[in-house]
Every structure is written in C-alpha cells, then in structure tokens.
C-alpha cells in the first residue's frame, strides 16, 4: 500500500510516524510515546536503548534475555537482583547479622540519631555532607576552604597544605618555598665582596 505524504510506520504500533514525533533506532522509526522497552515498558532514550533484531529493550531487560548466562556471569554493576538461585537447585543461606557494638550515651538527640559529624579545622563547627570539601585530609566548609594568608577561595587544583593549614600555591611559594637568587623573588640582599 503506498504511503501518500505520510511518514514512516512506527515499529511498535504500526501507525504513521511524522517527523516531529519520530525517534529512529536501528533503522526503524518510533513515536516518542511508543519508544518503550518491549519487556518492562520502561520509557527509553538513546542512552538506555538496546536493540535486538526488530525489538527494543532497556539495557537491563536486554541483558537478562540476551546476555551471558550461568554461574559467574553477573548482571553487571548497577543491577540488583533478588534471584536466589532456587530454580537452579541452589540453597539460599542468609548470613547472620554481626552483633552491634555497644554505644556510649550521647547527650544530643541529633548526634544519637545521625552520628557525630566531623569538625571544620578553620571554624570548629560541624561539617555536613552537603557543604563538605576535603583538603589536607580533613573536611572543610566550602566557605572556610580559603587560603590562610590572602583569603582566596581554593579548589583542588590550587590548594597546598602545611601544618594543617591551607594555602593557595602563590602564598605557599612566597612563604614556604625556596629563597635566594634564581628562585623568583629575591628575599635577601646579596653582599658583594670587594
């Protein structure tokens, strides 16, 4: 049957796909609304699609159907499975939970609930994950992550530490770097012997 002025046929629903709603995969056209995994019906995009002949799948379902199988072939990183192997005649044994260590009493309700947080070396206040920057092996607030001399904001590429304090590379070189002739800034006057 001729296709008079219409677009290609959708690989899922077989209806006409017009250019504005078309997604192409593996030489076939799909409506944006039809571009779903044929197994789990999860919506797909160019980064999550895996094609097999004329069928499209999400990467997880594709791996289950067409990936390697057997003992030693995991489903890959990021895939959780509740398969215990009973269908293979394997016995699932849950490992015993380790005994919890005795905890000391903590006066703060927040500390007891969420654990003690680390302290910022500059201001001495608690550093929480959302504001944490690591420097010199210690946690800092983003606002405290500055050069101790000039106050310039630091990044991982321009930070140096000495004796637990942070410095930008310029201040570190001026204050702790080598001195004398041939090392940039002449800090001592050289006396001429006559």
Curated annotation (Swiss-Prot):
Post-translational modification: Phosphorylated by PKC/PRKCA.
Transmembrane segments: none
Chain spans, region Interaction with CLF2: 94-105
Phenotype caused by lack of the gene: Mutant mice developed dilated cardiomyopathy with hypertrophy and heart failure after birth. Ultrastructural analysis revealed a dramatic disruption of cardiomyocyte cytoarchitecture. At birth, these hearts are not hypertrophic, but already abnormally soft, with cell-autonomous and Csrp3-sensitive alterations in cytoarchitecture. The morphological, functional, and molecular features of the cardiac phenotype in mutant adult mice are undistinguishable from those seen in human heart failure resulting from dilated cardiomyopathy of various etiolologies, these mice can thus be used as model.
Principal subcellular localization: nucleus
Pfam (any one): LIM
CDD domains named among the record's database cross-references: LIM1_CRP3, LIM2_CRP3
Short motif (Nuclear localization signal): ranges: 64-69
Sites of Phosphoserine modification: 95, 111, 153
Subcellular location: Nucleus; Cytoplasm; Cytoplasm, Cytoskeleton; Cytoplasm, Myofibril, Sarcomere, Z line
Keyword Protein biosynthesis: no
Region (Interaction with TCAP): 1-5
Example GO molecular function: actin binding
Function: Positive regulator of myogenesis. Acts as a cofactor for myogenic bHLH transcription factors such as MYOD1, and probably MYOG and MYF6. Enhances the DNA-binding activity of the MYOD1:TCF3 isoform E47 complex and may promote formation of a functional MYOD1:TCF3 isoform E47:MEF2A complex involved in myogenesis. Plays a crucial and specific role in the organization of cytosolic structures in cardiomyocytes. Could play a role in mechanical stretch sensing. May be a scaffold protein that promotes the assembly of interacting proteins at Z-line structures.
Stated name of the protein: Cysteine and glycine-rich protein 3
UniProt organism field: Mus musculus (Mouse)
Taxonomic placement: Eukaryota, Metazoa, Chordata, Craniata, Vertebrata
């Amino acid at each position: 049957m001729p296709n008079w002025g219409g677009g290609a046929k959708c690989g899922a629903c077989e209806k006409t796909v017009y250019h504005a709603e078309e997604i192409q995969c593996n030489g076939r056209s799909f409506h944006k609304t039809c571009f779903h995994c044929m197994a789990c019906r999860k919506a797909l995009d160019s980064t999550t699609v895996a094609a097999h002949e004329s069928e499209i799948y999400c990467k997880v379902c594709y791996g289950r159907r067409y990936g390697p199988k057997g003992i030693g072939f995991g489903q890959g990183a990021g895939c959780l499975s509740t398969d215990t192997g009973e269908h293979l005649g394997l016995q699932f044994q849950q490992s015993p939970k380790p005994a919890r260590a005795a905890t000391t009493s903590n006066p703060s309700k927040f500390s007891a609930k969420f654990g003690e947080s680390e302290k910022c070396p500059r201001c001495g206040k608690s550093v929480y994950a959302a504001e944490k920057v690591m420097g010199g092996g210690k946690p800092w607030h983003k606002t405290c992550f500055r050069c101790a001399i000039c106050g310039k904001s630091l990044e991982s590429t321009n930070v140096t530490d000495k004796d637990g304090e942070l410095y930008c590379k310029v201040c570190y070189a001026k204050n702790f770097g080598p001195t004398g002739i041939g090392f940039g800034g002449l800090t001592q006057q050289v006396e001429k012997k006559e």
